[in-house]
């Protein structure tokens, strides 16, 4: 068998396993506790960017509380359909949870136009009406993170179990992350401009796999 054939017929699970071996080798000594390390490694796996080993900031009980809540059936609120699409809904549903995303709803767009704000901000207000424990996964829109910060500060929303705040970009991105880090809420935040939908989904999936004891690393 040629080298090309060997590459073509490598099984997805084998590729993933080898990828995590490479990440472990290149990451080296990191000083992270085992569960936090799994989250960091899954983000690196999704992005091929080792900068996240330094830029990801975890509040004291972020991973522990996130895993426990998902295991108990917490649902996930995503700021975009891309984040929602990347989350392993099969594993989430096995615990009784689901993914909510409101940004594409017609009435959300209409209300945003009427109020002169963004669909992302209105989406967070819609999420505030949901019952039960929630994990927020914000990977694209800093306006969603800003709206969530306001809702938490105004006590207009039950305190989220966990906020994954990893929007990407240049405008209000750093500021929105710093505000969430100052709130009395467990959080996982990518400091700086980097982040994205892929990062948000990877973090949620890492927590789901930890909750299900799925050794995908």
Where are these predicted regions, by residue range?
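Charged, compositionally biased N-terminal leader segments and the immediate start
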Residues: 1-34
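Internal catalytic-core helix/loop-beta-alpha segment
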Residues: 14, 115-149
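A short, well-structured juxtamembrane/interface segment
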Residues: 54-69
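Buried hydrophobic positions in well-ordered alpha/beta secondary-structure cores of metabolic enzymes
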Residues: 79, 163-165, 203
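Short glycine/serine/threonine-rich phosphate/pyrophosphate-binding segments
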Residues: 83-86, 142-148, 170-174, 196-200
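Long, charge-dense
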Residues: 92-131
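C-terminal functional extensions of proteins
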Residues: 157, 171-217
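ADP-ribose/adenylate-binding Rossmann-like module
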Residues: 161-171
């Amino acid at each position: 068998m040629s080298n090309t054939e060997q590459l073509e017929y490598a099984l997805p699970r084998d590729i993933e396993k080898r990828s995590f071996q490479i990440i472990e080798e290149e990451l080296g000594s990191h000083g992270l506790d085992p569960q936090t390390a799994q989250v960091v490694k899954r983000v690196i796996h999704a992005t091929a960017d080792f900068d996240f080993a330094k830029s990801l900031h975890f509040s004291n009980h972020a991973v522990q509380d996130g895993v426990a809540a998902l295991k108990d059936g917490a649902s996930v609120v995503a700021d975009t359909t891309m984040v929602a699409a990347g989350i392993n809904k099969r594993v989430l549903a096995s615990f009784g949870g689901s993914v909510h995303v409101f940004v594409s709803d017609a009435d959300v767009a209409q209300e945003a136009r009427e109020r002169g704000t963004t669909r992302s901000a209105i989406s967070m207000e819609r999420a505030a009406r949901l019952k039960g424990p929630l994990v927020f996964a914000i990977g694209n829109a800093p306006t969603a993170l800003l709206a969530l910060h306001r809702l938490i500060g105004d006590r207009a929303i039950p305190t989220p179990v966990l906020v994954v705040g990893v929007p990407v970009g240049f405008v209000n991105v750093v500021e929105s992350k710093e505000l969430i880090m100052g709130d009395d809420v467990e959080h996982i935040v990518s400091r700086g401009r980097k982040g994205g939908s892929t990062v948000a989904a990877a973090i949620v999936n890492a927590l789901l796999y930890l909750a299900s004891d799925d050794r995908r690393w």
